[in-house]
């Protein structure tokens, strides 16, 4: 019976190893087929992805070449694989692009790179999830296997862990390559941005230089024109004074001629008519006085009308009239008044000659011999008083406008004031330009600081990602520890169940052969107890090693997290200092902007003074127009004279043309002043935009502060999570210690039982020796199986090398695993059933 039991045990052991061998062969074939299918699917998708990536790189190169030299529309159509049709239609690139278009395209490129970066990150996350799911499915399949596979589980896990480590390494390498590519693209974009800023600054400098040159040219032309205008005006004033002096001398000569005529007529009269002649002269002089008084009264009325008309019409009609209408209106009034005065003078002269005729009729004898002289003298007497009265009108009007001679001085003073105002305005503009340059430099510093902040934010995002990865690794380690605990508990349960079954079988055998082989039974039972003790000790050591490794890994992870936390603290302190510096700079900028606003107020005040001066100039121009009208009137009066009419007309026409040219030039200068005002308004708008940008920068800094506060809150939450993880690790260590205590207690009880049965199983020593020999044979077989497994491992390594060549394109493993997951799930279940 003992021999039959040994043979049965050997047969069972052989069938068990044959089962194991068959299952290993089947699993190897299945894994080979699955890996080949995965590799083929990955190769196809990798080829497609390589083609698409090559197309994208080619299009990106073409796009970068466009930024260097310009692209055509046909080359831009090849860029459609990266962007949608709407984006291509909106991006109508031209060879002559404006600065705003270039900045818009630069921003679109940055957004496009950010989108690609986010897509790559999402794809890497999906790939990591698929690999983790595959790893979990393999661990589950290994966990489902029977308890007899526990000894081979370590070897298979080592092989699988090596493959997964290689996969993780290749994934990290791919991620690093993609990150380096994106970093280089960011550097290229930053360089292009700096070049664009330099080009913009050069363009602005060119525009400023051109504007300065044009201003200098316009200023010189304006000054030359003003000097010429003043010279012409001075000449005109001198000529007018000379003409007035000539008119006054002419009047005196005419008066002398008239006196000579009257004296000659009186000489022809007889002595007894001397009294009548005296009477005539007295009457003539009285009439002349009355006529001059009437003329003066007429002039006074004219002056009153001239003074009254503007007062009456300034508020009603003159506001609604243009310059030409006003000139025609006043010319009509002046012509009417002149005609009225001429009619009055004509009446007086007629009365004079009627009286003289009556006198001559009374003295009838003296008229006959002098009829011819009388006719000539009558004609002269009619013309000479008219000319004298007109000359008196001209002199009276000259006396009415004594300020005409002093206008040169007033214009000179106004010119000096305008020069002073212009110099002050230029100084203020230079100060405004300097302040604008300072503001631009400060804005460039702010932009550099924002770029640095963005870089720090990217670094913070990377640190947060690393923290998330560490958290995932911690969770994976915890999951692996829990799975291992479950596996070992199952294994211990199987061991305890097998030991109980063996003990029961041994008890049955012992009862059967108790009477015959007491000594042999005690020896065999003792050997079995020793084997069980060895197995229990091995399991205890394995559990201790696993728990120690888990604790070491947890400690290492905690140390790394602590170091990363310290680095983040240092980075945040540096960012806080930079934020404080930026706030101080922004405060300084705000103060400078307040100063600029004050300077703008001063400029506005100076502009108001300039407008006042221009209004004064306008008034002087109105007076000059009045003078011009008076000159025209003088020309009309002097046109009746033959000698002075032609010269006066020519000179007045010349002066009139010069004044018209001066008016046109003044209008041109007004337009230039309006353009300068428009440029000042544009500069004020630019300053307002700069203020708006500064406010935007302040808002961004506030947002950064809120982000820092949120990061601090997240850091506190992470600390709490780490503390929870430490507590869980401590609890798991306590659970392991309790489990060890329980196992030791059970082992002690089992040892007591085995010692009790050891005294009854000495007779089974020989069979135990035979079993040892058979175990040696089976160990040799195991070594052969291990060599076979090593060969399989080498083949798997070769397959892993093949997979490493295609690891840059392992993004679609999840699909292949889903495709072949039924096969992987089918075989472990069949094995378990068998």
From Swiss-Prot:
Subcellular location: Golgi apparatus; Cytoplasm
Alphabetic keyword roster: Coiled coil, Cytoplasm, Golgi apparatus
InterPro entries for this protein: WAP (IPR037490)
GO CC, any one term: Golgi apparatus
Chief subcellular location: Golgi
Top-level taxon in the UniProt lineage: Eukaryota
Coiled-coil annotated residue ranges, if any: 410-456, 574-700, 792-812
Reported tissue expression: Expressed in seedlings, leaves and fruits.
Name of this chain's protein: WPP domain-associated protein
Organism of this sequence: Solanum lycopersicum (Tomato)
Origin organism lineage: Eukaryota, Viridiplantae, Streptophyta, Embryophyta, Tracheophyta
